[in-house]
Regions:
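Catalytic nucleophile-loop/oxyanion-hole region of alpha/beta-hydrolase
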Residues: 58-88
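Active-site signature of alpha/beta-hydrolase-fold catalytic machinery across serine-
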Residues: 106-110
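A short loop-to-beta-strand scaffold at the N-terminal edge of the catalytic core in hydrolase folds
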Residues: 1-11
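Short, surface-exposed "cap/lid" segments of acyl-processing enzymes
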Residues: 11-54
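Alpha/beta-hydrolase active-site loop signature
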Residues: 26, 55-60, 125
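Alpha/beta-hydrolase fold nucleophile elbow
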Residues: 85-98
Length: 192
């Protein structure tokens, strides 16, 4: 399977629960990494063990982002939660930020694993709109360079044809962008 990295923050005593952090996408994670680590330390000091996931193809995990998919990332969450359930019998909480919050919500709606709570920070609410925002970053960065301007529609076509594109220093593939685009709150009414 895909190898991925986790960082764990343990409690000095038996934890009240174990919180698993589901990260945001791309530069959003890099910009908030210190904040997330500090919050995880605070959770641990308050009696809540915490694990931060670097999804396959991101951070310190193996693989390339262009080869990632939502299915792979959900397997990363599943394996992490399954391992924690085997190791300790405490409630499990998914904590997600931005895209990670939406992925956590989607995972909780579809998973057979017992997830006791969700902690969602600034969740995106529409995958298609979020992908458009990501692709606009590419359009904006290319606008200052010579050559014909590229539109989000053209980028979507390239991704759909299996090409990878670079956005803000990250090479992304069509499968992941299609997966993110398909996320919709309308499909998650089972949690309401």
């Amino acid at each position: 399977g895909e190898r991925y990295f986790t960082l764990q923050f343990s409690c000095p005593q038996q934890p009240k629960a174990h919180i698993v952090f589901v990260p945001p996408f791309g530069e959003e994670m890099n910009r908030c990494r210190a904040l997330v680590s500090e919050q995880a330390r605070r959770f641990a000091r308050s009696g809540y063990a915490c694990t931060i996931i670097d999804f396959y193809g991101t951070g310190d995990s193996q693989g390339e982002l262009r080869d990632a998919s939502l299915q792979i990332w959900q397997r990363n969450i599943h394996l992490t939660l399954e391992t924690l359930q085997r190791e300790m019998s405490v409630p499990l909480i998914l904590w997600g930020l931005r895209l990670g919050a939406f992925i956590a919500l989607d995972f909780a709606a579809k998973s057979a694993l017992a997830i006791d709570s969700l902690l969602l920070w600034q969740p995106i609410i529409a995958g298609e709109r979020y992908v458009t925002q990501i692709l606009r970053q590419r359009v904006a960065s290319l606008a200052s360079k010579e050559g014909a301007p590229e539109t989000t529609t053209e980028i979507r076509k390239r991704l759909a044809q299996g090409e990878s594109v670079e956005v803000s220093g990250y090479t992304i593939g069509g499968a992941l962008m299609a997966d993110i685009e398909s996320l919709s709150l309308a499909h998650l009414t089972a949690l309401c």
